[in-house]
Amino acid sequence: MYYRDMKKKYVIGIVFAILMVSLFYLKRENNTRALFSWRSEVISEEADELIEFINDNKFNTLYQEFDLDDVESIQAFGNKTDIQLYHLCGSPDWDIERIKEEILAVYKVNQDITTNIKGLVVDIEPYLKADWDKNKKKIMNSYIDDMIEANEYAAKLGLEYFLCIPYWYEAGNVDRLVKDGCDGLVVMNYYKGKELEHLSDEMESCFRYNKELVTAFEMQEAGKHDLSENNTYHDEGLGAVNEIYEKIYNRYPRIGLAVHYYDVLK
């Protein structure tokens, strides 16, 4: 009797352990691992190579700048992969009407294809405006208002709306953006060794409002776009990025990963 009870407890313990491990890996599999790709023609000219790179590096999400007029190429690419697709777009000179045009264009593409573009990843960078230093507060408030309106519009069309932001926005601005201006943040977290420290405000807001948070790593070589060695993992490679992200994930498993960008990695 004692032996049977012990054996039963042992079996239950093994089953429980297997279940926990399975849930852990399922959670990891569902966590965002995104790749940026800015060149729209890559999905037609290098589709197989891109998909192979995605699979080899265990990405499950692609932030791709699509040519929204080339519906045939978007459909053909979508037929080859089940990766989650988001339209990557944006420019400092985009006003709310231009942003809404892009949202509507994505919606219309989805009506014409069986592949689904889940939403938009919008990289506006208002701090690149010529008068930023003189009118920072006004520009930022206008940007936040635009993002709130754009997010509402995207939601009405059934599209997710993510924002790319730098790690240094003031906490109050981050909170306003997260609360009403997006479904989640992709933080361009370009400062080696301080990735977690620089996510503190974004974590507080995203966790409070139950929004997604993704930390992005730069892979371009130092010297380009004013990048220094402190900003990029170009020399260290994806292996180092994965090690850093693993430490972040172990503490905060809700945080996803993004890598910027495909053309400098292939």
Q: What does each model-found stretch correspond to?
A:
Residues Y2-A17:
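N-terminal Sec-pathway targeting helices
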Residues F59, Q64-D67, L128, A171-S200:
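Aromatic- and acid-rich polysaccharide-binding/catalytic face
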Residues L50-F53, T61-S91, K134-Y161:
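Aromatic-lined substrate-binding rim segments of carbohydrate-active enzymes
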Residues Y63-F66, V106-M140, I255-V259:
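Active-site groove signature of glycoside hydrolases
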Residues K192, E212-K266:
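Substrate-binding cleft of secreted/luminal carbohydrate-active enzymes
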Residues S40-N55, R98-I113, Y169-V178, L199, ...:
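Short, acidic/polar
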Residues W38, Q84-W94, I144-N173, E212-G223, ...:
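Aromatic-lined carbohydrate-recognition surfaces of secreted/lumenal glycan-active proteins
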Residues L23-L68, F162-Y167, G256-L265:
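Boundary/entry segment of secreted carbohydrate-active catalytic domains
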